[in-house]
Amino acid sequence: MKYDHILVRFGEISTKGKNRKKFIEKLRQHIRFVLKDFVALKYASDRDRITIMLNGEDPEPISEQLKGVFGIQSFSLAVKCETNLDAIKEAALTAVQEVYEQGNTFKVSTKRSYKQFELDSNEMNREIGGHVLRNTENLTVNVKQPDVHLRIEIREQATYITFKDVKGAGGLPVGSSGRAMLMLSGGFDSPVAGYQAMKRGIQIEAVHFFSPPYTSERAKQKVIDLTECLAAYGGEIKLHIVPFTKIQELIHKQVPENYTMTSTRRMMLKIADKIREKRDALAIITGESLGQVASQTLESMYAINHVTNTPIIRPLIAVDKNDIIDEARRIGTYETSIQPFEDCCTIFTPPSPKTKPKLEKVERYESFADFEPMLDEAVEQIETIIVKNEKKAADEFADLF
């Protein structure tokens, strides 16, 4: 079947009222970015969809790319024809004859957006259905479960013929809900949290804490690889790598062992907040799941959160670990997360961390040392990497040989 258009339908954008144009433009920009390698494509948008003109490009790889774009409810490969009865009948017959097999059943569904068209939807179904039946051998009607579902959308400027809707990623276009900092470790949780935040329209920048020589370059590369996985869904992502060794060493020197985990998380959150302020972001995202580990009890989160008034977004707070792992598999981060390279969250883990730390105690322990200059120094020494999804380009290069 030689399709010449793709019809892209919005998800929740349709409910956004006065901000609708902004959301549609964000989605259009992201679609253009994702499909930038397909140079012949042209785009048009209106109130309820974006139309992609293929101009000879292969629709299959384009469809695969569109499936991961947040803000798309569904899309359809389409054939365009003129909005007159004879042209529609001819295009519908040609389309059915290209896709059907001997003995198939079919059904016609018409959506008539152009109300001045000469026939209504039911009349069109009968007219087109009869024309197709008369001119196609061994084809019968089945309105409940057809093998071929011919869909006709009549608009004033053009009519589009499609056969199926492809489910999109849903959610909101990346960037339409503002920017936030993702505290990214090498585990399962934080990449999934980042994915969920992007699905709600947040443009993420990742913050990773790196503690050489206790953590290796391979652990750092693991986080870069995880960021690359996420970039497949949100375009390029800035990854801020924070030197954290001196701060961790001071924590373990000054803070009682069972409070070191709490203090470490507080310092991380302080640094993430300083970066957030520099980057004009509005929130911090974490992969915390209630009760999963000692630092994720309500008491721990209360003591840790006390260092900032910035909103903390926790997409996974009520999600079970097994469900998080299943989601990691689905979005493609699982195989990277299982690599056995320790990050700074695991190398200094005490044998019996406090599950119900007291805020006044951790504040008193931290007062024994002046952490603030070290936090500022860490922020100044950040290494920032712009991460793109290079896997697609590498796969395309490999296909040449």
From Swiss-Prot:
Keyword Ion transport attributed: no
A Gene Ontology biological process term: thiamine biosynthetic process
Domain of life of the organism encoding this protein: Bacteria
Coiled coil, from the record: none
Example of a GO cellular component annotation carried by this entry: cytosol
GO terms of molecular function: ATP binding; CCA tRNA nucleotidyltransferase activity; tRNA binding; tRNA-uracil-4 sulfurtransferase activity
Chain residues that bind ATP: 183-184, 208-209, 265, 287, 296
Subcellular location: Cytoplasm
Catalyses which reaction(s): [ThiI sulfur-carrier protein]-S-sulfanyl-L-cysteine + a uridine in tRNA + 2 reduced [2Fe-2S]-[ferredoxin] + ATP + H(+) = [ThiI sulfur-carrier protein]-L-cysteine + a 4-thiouridine in tRNA + 2 oxidized [2Fe-2S]-[ferredoxin] + AMP + diphosphate; [ThiS sulfur-carrier protein]-C-terminal Gly-Gly-AMP + S-sulfanyl-L-cysteinyl-[cysteine desulfurase] + AH2 = [ThiS sulfur-carrier protein]-C-terminal-Gly-aminoethanethioate + L-cysteinyl-[cysteine desulfurase] + A + AMP + 2 H(+)
Keywords noted in UniProt: ATP-binding, Cytoplasm, Nucleotide-binding, RNA-binding, Thiamine biosynthesis, Transferase, tRNA-binding
Main subcellular location of this protein, as a coarse class: cytoplasm
PROSITE patterns given in the database record: THUMP (PS51165)
Pathway participation: Cofactor biosynthesis; thiamine diphosphate biosynthesis
THUMP domain span: 60-165
EC number(s) per entry: 2.8.1.4
HAMAP family found in the cross-reference section: ThiI
Role of this protein: Catalyzes the ATP-dependent transfer of a sulfur to tRNA to produce 4-thiouridine in position 8 of tRNAs, which functions as a near-UV photosensor. Also catalyzes the transfer of sulfur to the sulfur carrier protein ThiS, forming ThiS-thiocarboxylate. This is a step in the synthesis of thiazole, in the thiamine biosynthesis pathway. The sulfur is donated as persulfide by IscS.
Family to which this protein belongs: Belongs to the ThiI family.
Name of the molecule in the record: Probable tRNA sulfurtransferase
Organism: Bacillus pumilus (strain SAFR-032)
Gene: thiI
